[in-house]
Each structure stands twice: as C-alpha cells, then as structure tokens.
Amino acid sequence: TELTYAIPTHNPLDPPQMIKNMGLIRNGLISLPIGRMDLIPDHYEIIDKRLNVPVDFPEFKFELRQSQKDVYDEIEDNAIINAWVSWGKTFTGLAIAGKLGQKTLVVTHTVPLRNQWAKEVKKVFGIEAGIIGSGRFELDAPIVIGNTQTLYRNIDKIRKEFGTIILDEMHHVSSPTFSKILDTNYCRYKIGLSGT
C-alpha cells in the first residue's frame, strides 16, 4: 500500500508534485516519514526498533548564541533545523549531538563539508572524528562523519552503529541514496540541518 498526496502548485498549469508517505520495505514492514504517525491504520502494530547507542561526549567548549540556545533547549527528539547561512548549524548540531549523548553519524554530500565537520568536532570537543570515506572506515569515535556515496556502499555495516544521525544539507534527502541511508538506519534520533 502507498499513501500519496499532492502538493498544490502556484501555477495551475503545472502538474501536481506527489509526496510518497508510506512505502513497503519488505513483506510486513512499512516505512513512514517521521512525524506522520497519523498515517498508520488502527489495525497496524507499531514495533519501535530504533537503537540507543550511548557514548560519553567531552564537554562542549563554547557558549551558544541565544538563537542557537533556544533551538538546543527545544530539541528532545527528531528535528529539522532550518536557518540562514552562517547561523551556526554545524556548531549547534554538534552541541545537540553532545546533549543527546548518542554515537552520532554526520551525513555530508561533499568531501569539503566532511572536512569542515571534522575540524569543528576537533574545535568544540577536542577529539578526532571518525571518518567514512576517502579510503577510511573509522567507527570508534563518538562522532563519525561520512560522505553519502560511501555510506550508501556500506549501508549494511552502519545501520545499527549509531543512536543519532545528523543530516547536513538535508534538502538533499529526496535523493534515493540519501533516503536509503535514512530509511535503513536504526538510530533513535534524526536531526536535519538546512539553509534553504
């Protein structure tokens, strides 16, 4: 069964864009978007298989600006943080990772973004991030940063390793590769960051 709905367009001549809300992963198992529990028929049994993978984070070394602190204080579960360029999404995302206390996978779509995240991890926590990509496959750090393509190729090795996933530039999540990484992962928390 699939549930879809049309997104209204501004131009009545444009075809409607469709959003797929429910997909069959395999017999007896469906995938729903986060926050759409209203789509689950009453006769379905919900089995939550999300994983907690607690780790000890070093102390976060910096103070958040008030707008960042407001977001940080609000987040207790899955969230999307949509803020302007230079607001400090990376910085705030790392603070939230520390707050949630779960082994964290940061998903990036470029090597420069992955490297930027690794520098920020070192700066704010004083630790080296694990890297997945460029011939490296390091899973032992509290925070691991990986490129989408490499994560996709290693999807079976990472699906039960993390308690939190942070999606940088999450507006790319509509790509099949990005979606597959999310849909097959057992992490407890999913945090999306976007500037668009």
Positions of PLM-derived features:
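The conserved Walker
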Residues: 85, 110, 194
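Interdomain "pre-motor" coupling segment immediately N-terminal to P-loop NTPase/helicase cores
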Residues: 2-51
